[in-house]
Amino acid sequence: MVQAFVNTVDVENGVEELTNPGQLHAALTRVGALDDGAPALTPADLRRALAVREALRALLHANVGLTPDPAALKLLDEVGSAGAFAVRFGADGSPTLAPKASGVDGALGRILAVVYSSMVAGTWSRLKACPRDVCGWVFYDRSRNSSSRWCSMSVCGNRTKMKRYRAQAVAR
């Protein structure tokens, strides 16, 4: 859910999937954060969701060793508060964290509940945002020791290493 939501923009190619409230509604429904019959979203909802998406990307950068922006963390705190969470128990008795809010606050709250649950489960550190400044693509690190840094070593990893090599060569 988190990966699909954050990857609704291709930073490198400048392709934005969420350009209007209807597209936001469709995307949040597709990732399971918004119920199918939820009311239409507004331009303000779109602005809030885009800000949260980038705050999540900043949080995911921490999983590759970068420090998240304090403003991004503050926004995520505000969204978490707006979600007003409750513990819900499924038919099998397993607990889940669910927002009491509806609309965009509820949808963004569901996404944050997934973040929280994956942190508690110990799987959050495997979801990462590519640290290459023009990329930021979110990927799941499937390496044995969770050491992947780039969304693609053959693309972003090589480009970054080549850029560093050239800078060192010029400095010599």
Predicted ranges, named:
Residues 1-129, 136:
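Short helix-coil boundary/hinge micro-motifs
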Residues 110-164, 170-172:
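BZIP DNA-binding basic region
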